[in-house]
Design a protein with these regions (language model features):
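Beta-strand-turn-beta hairpins that frame and shape the catalytic cleft
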Residues: 2-8, 83-91, 117-123, 215
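Zn-dependent metallo-beta-lactamase
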Residues: 1-9, 14-18, 92, 174, ...
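Binuclear metal-ion centers of metallo-dependent hydrolases, dominated by the metallo-beta-lactamase
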Residues: 57, 69-82, 164, 168-215
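Active-site-proximal loop/helix segments of hydrolase catalytic cores
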Residues: 102-168
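Pre-active-site segment of Zn-dependent metallo-hydrolases
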Residues: 2-38, 44-52, 99-105, 129-143
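Glycine/small-residue-rich loop that forms an oxyanion/phosphate-binding "nest" at active or ligand-binding sites
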Residues: 44-52, 56-102
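Active-site neighborhood of phospho(di)ester-bond hydrolases with catalytic His/Asp-centered motifs
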Residues: 9-11, 30-38, 57-61, 124-129, ...
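Active-site environment of divalent metal-dependent phosphoester hydrolases
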Residues: 16-17, 39-44, 65-67, 82-85, ...
Length: 215
């Protein structure tokens, strides 16, 4: 994402992702990296990208901050419920219902999502999560959303039907689907997923890797 000229990366998983073979992680440039949790398919390229972007700031829950501060990265710790103002806008860390560990299975803190409140738009990035009633707190505590980025692959996270309900909970009409088709456990039927959203008057956007959109 890009807000106020700053490039924000979330959960970088490129190496080992068969759908992203056209992307060279060594060529990625960013100003911030936001991590929702520590699972391998969300941090696979973190250290390479951080090395190539030494001024980039890693933002995550306390345990993620502690792990990567020890590795020499610039970090900013957050925890759920808190806001912090960055140079592109302010961000709130919010609840996610999932698990979180580093690749060595050590504790990576609690999984989380983020709400980005910026002059260019308001975006909710849920991270990996199940449907939760806590999502109803987002429109009560945050500005109206322009876009929600929600997982739809089922098995490890919400499926499209639950994600469409999540879109109702957070009061957002445009949803960018994520966490689907990367491997066999989370392959989906695209038409069925789109129908789950359209039946609730919501738009589901299924982008190809390397694509871009404006909101």
């Amino acid at each position: 994402m890009e807000f106020s000229g700053k490039r924000i990366l979330t959960d970088p998983f490129i190496s080992g992702n068969s759908l992203a073979q056209s992307i060279d992680p060594a060529g990625i440039r960013c100003d911030y990296i936001f991590l929702s949790h520590g699972h391998p398919d969300h941090i696979a390229d973190l250290e390479l990208i951080a090395k190539n972007n030494p001024d980039a700031v890693l933002v995550g829950i306390w345990e993620i901050h502690a792990r990567y501060t020890e590795k020499g990265m610039k970090t900013h710790p957050m925890n759920k419920g808190g806001w912090w103002t960055f140079d592109f806008g302010r961000v709130k860390m919010v609840q996610a219902v999932h698990s979180s560990s580093f690749p060595d299975l050590s504790y990576a803190g609690s999984p989380a999502g983020f709400v980005f409140d910026t002059p260019d738009g308001v975006v909710y990035f849920s991270g990996d999560t199940a449907l939760t009633m806590d999502m109803k707190l987002i429109p009560m505590t945050c500005p109206p959303l322009d876009l929600a980025i929600l997982p739809i692959g089922s098995n490890f996270t919400m499926d499209a039907h639950d994600a469409a309900l999540a879109a109702e909970f957070v009061e957002c009409d445009r949803v960018l689907g994520c966490h689907y088709d990367t491997f066999g456990f989370i392959e989906i039927n695209h038409r069925e997923a789109e129908a789950a959203f359209s039946s609730k008057g919501k738009e589901l956007i299924l982008m190809k890797v390397g694509g871009h959109m404006e909101f």
